[in-house]
């Protein structure tokens, strides 16, 4: 097994923690950052006080308000979050050039060749967390292991403000006890399919041969086969220019009603818009992805002036859906993607929303 030293750093309830830091009166109170609870927006982040009420990211804001009527709802300040994130990313690069940001609040670091702290990834992670708190007043959790898969899982085990290490010699035993839903790349639909096959843990997955996995999961088979053994050779890649932002969902039961399809796509538009806002991007092309019940897949696209808001994205979806066989053929998956990306400032984003 590879003896790389990988750290996954994940800020704790990042957006909500920034708001509690900047507004001391909110400390200890349930804080939700995201859309208007009286509208169709979604939760971008929830403080740990809010999470105790069952609130989580991507949840409709109206539902979060029902779960916790006393929660404080705030609009995101993405320009502030991006500034803090840039400060943290600069700190990471003091230790290694191999930094792969996943979003504003998390990143992988390959510190295999870092000489600091005697080359100990655990001590490096501890020092990074301490420096983040010293410089920003925010806490971060970190996971340390021999690959990205294990480091990311480890970072979630002692949240908030925690550090967890999975040594290479414990990797296989750790994955064996892991629910398959925690394995990288296993979404809800794949998890349900695995469970119907009697696969509920990493140990169950490991019992399947590569041929059995290929019959069930096609091109993803080798990936699952390796992860079930605690192996993940994906390198830490410094960020490359993003070409598109998208979200999709597979339905437990096929959809037949176009009106329901548009309703189900609204949260996807919200997610894409939130991602664009976080990155300071807008896009000229909106693409609809449709997978029918027989697994035939098509895409339809519309291009125009750059869009960033959820309302602008949703406005293009009816025409795209009308150009498909939705309503005549059952649909099992829908996806929304924005491409042709351009960088926009907060002022430019506000101007876009006026048109």
Swiss-Prot record:
PROSITE patterns: UMUC
Active site: 106
Annotated CDD domains: PolY_Pol_IV_kappa (cd03586)
E.C. number: 2.7.7.7
A GO BP entry: error-prone translesion synthesis
Domain UmuC: from-to ranges: 6-187
Ligand binding (Mg(2+)): 10, 105
GO CC terms in record: cytosol
Subcellular location(s) of the protein: Cytoplasm
Residues of the site described as Substrate discrimination: 15
Bound cofactor: record note: Binds 2 magnesium ions per subunit.
Cofactor or coenzyme needed: Mg(2+)
MF terms in GO: damaged DNA binding; DNA-directed DNA polymerase activity; magnesium ion binding
The organism's place on the tree of life at top rank: Bacteria
Main location class: cytoplasm
Keywords for this protein: Cytoplasm, DNA damage, DNA repair, DNA replication, DNA-binding, DNA-directed DNA polymerase, Magnesium, Metal-binding, Mutator protein, Nucleotidyltransferase, Transferase
Catalytic activity: DNA(n) + a 2'-deoxyribonucleoside 5'-triphosphate = DNA(n+1) + diphosphate
DNA-binding as UniProt keyword: yes
Protein family (similarity comment): Belongs to the DNA polymerase type-Y family.
Subunit details: Monomer.
Known function: Poorly processive, error-prone DNA polymerase involved in untargeted mutagenesis. Copies undamaged DNA at stalled replication forks, which arise in vivo from mismatched or misaligned primer ends. These misaligned primers can be extended by PolIV. Exhibits no 3'-5' exonuclease (proofreading) activity. May be involved in translesional synthesis, in conjunction with the beta clamp from PolIII.
Protein's UniProt name: DNA polymerase IV
Species of the source: Alkalilimnicola ehrlichii (strain ATCC BAA-1101 / DSM 17681 / MLHE-1)
């Amino acid at each position: 097994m590879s003896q790389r030293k990988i750290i996954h750093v994940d800020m704790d309830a990042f957006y909500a923690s920034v708001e509690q830091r900047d507004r001391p009166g909110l400390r200890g109170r349930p804080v939700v950052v995201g859309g208007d609870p009286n509208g169709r927006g979604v939760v971008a982040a929830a403080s740990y006080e809010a999470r105790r009420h069952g609130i989580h990211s991507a949840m409709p804001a109206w539902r979060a308000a029902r779960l916790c009527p006393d929660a404080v709802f705030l609009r995101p300040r993405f320009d502030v979050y991006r500034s803090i994130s840039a400060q943290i990313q600069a700190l990471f690069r003091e230790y290694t050039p191999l930094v792969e940001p996943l979003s504003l609040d998390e990143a992988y670091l390959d510190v295999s060749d870092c000489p600091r702290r005697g080359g100990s990834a655990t001590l490096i992670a501890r020092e990074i967390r301490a420096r983040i708190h010293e410089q920003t007043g925010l806490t971060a959790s970190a996971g340390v292991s021999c690959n990205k898969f294990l480091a990311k899982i480890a970072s979630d085990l002692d949240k908030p403000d925690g550090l967890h290490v999975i040594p290479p010699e414990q990797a296989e035993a750790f994955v064996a006890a892991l629910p398959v839903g925690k394995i990288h790349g296993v979404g809800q639909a794949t998890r349900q399919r695995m469970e119907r096959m009697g696969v509920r843990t990493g140990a169950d997955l490991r019992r399947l041969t590569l041929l059995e996995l290929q019959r069930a999961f096609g091109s993803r088979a080798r990936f699952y086969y390796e992860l079930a053994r605690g192996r993940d050779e994906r390198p830490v890649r410094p960020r490359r220019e993003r070409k598109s932002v998208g979200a999709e969902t597979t339905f437990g039961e096929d959809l037949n009603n176009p009106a329901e399809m548009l309703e189900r796509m609204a949260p996807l538009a919200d997610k894409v818009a939130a991602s664009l806002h976080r990155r300071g991007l807008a896009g000229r092309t909106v693409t609809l992805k449709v997978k029918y019940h027989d697994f035939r897949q098509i895409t339809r696209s519309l291009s125009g002036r750059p869009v960033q808001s959820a309302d602008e994205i949703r406005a293009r979806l009816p025409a795209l859906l009308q150009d498909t066989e939705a309503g005549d053929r059952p649909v099992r998956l829908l996806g929304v993607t924005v491409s042709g990306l351009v960088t926009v400032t907060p002022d430019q984003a506000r101007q876009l929303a006026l048109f």
